[in-house]
Amino acid sequence: MDLAHTRTGSGEPVLLLHGITHRRQGWDLVAPLLAGEREVWAVDLPDHGESPDLPPEYTGDIGPLADAVEAFCRTQGLERPHVVGNSLGGLVALELAARGTVRSATALSPAGFWSRAGRLWARAVLGGAHALLAPIPSARLRQMLATPFLRTALVGLLLAHPSRIDPDQITADLHGLSHPRSSFRTMLAHLDSWTVPQRAAVPTTVGWGARDLLLPRSQSKRLRRALPDAAVYILPGCGHVPMGDDPALVAELVLAATRPRPA
């Protein structure tokens, strides 16, 4: 599958994966901070952004997304890149780490480490946000996001500091949630089928937003039990999408996680 992507920088390759209904531009504030030391590939996952659709028989699980990323790497000649993912992209990154097909994995507030209540909460928030945003024309949404109070009300569950993101950027980011592609409903209906890896074959780092309201940082305890060798850090002042809240902190974490390790 030929995934839409943006490439910049030079050095060891780092693949950046976004969350559900998001897009590769969600990494725009982080990518320039990495590009001086890494070759950065920001990628739209299948059925997101400008990438092709998933097949009609897609059942909502993670495996086909990881398969598509692996196929993309083969097509681009990327041999075992580092991979970094947020939310859904974080779970895909951990799946690739379990397969051993990447050099290292960094996951930011990865999905899947929820209890039943946490899973129902995530489904309710995402489904409710879609229902709220779908009837609002883009121009009207842009006007609403220009108001600090409404911007916080609309995206405060995703960002701890919504004021740090340009309203035009947020409007574009929310398009995938207000007008999602077919996999969105399939994924929401089958969140209980998302299995989390029980091993990592490569060095693995996790950053969890201290102020994540969608997937609270308490879920990191489940991750620690599943992946005891992972290095887990709590990201102060960050919500569910830390790339928007503190791009410098995220870049620092990624650069540290992707530095060559002593043999």
Segments (PLM) and residue ranges:
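Catalytic histidine-centered segment of alpha/beta-hydrolase-like enzymes
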Residues: 238-251
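Flexible "cap/lid" loop of the alpha/beta hydrolase fold
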Residues: 102-137
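Conserved HGGG/HGGXW glycine-rich cap/lid loop of the alpha/beta-hydrolase fold
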Residues: 4-53
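Conserved serine/cysteine hydrolase catalytic core
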Residues: 179-225, 234
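Active-site loop/oxyanion-hole signature of alpha/beta-hydrolase fold enzymes
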Residues: 8, 41-88, 252
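Conserved alpha/beta-hydrolase "nucleophile elbow" surrounding the catalytic nucleophile
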Residues: 18-20, 81, 85-87, 209
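Short glycine-enriched nucleophile-adjacent loop
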Residues: 90-100, 105
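Conserved alpha/beta-hydrolase catalytic His-Asp/Glu region
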Residues: 140-198
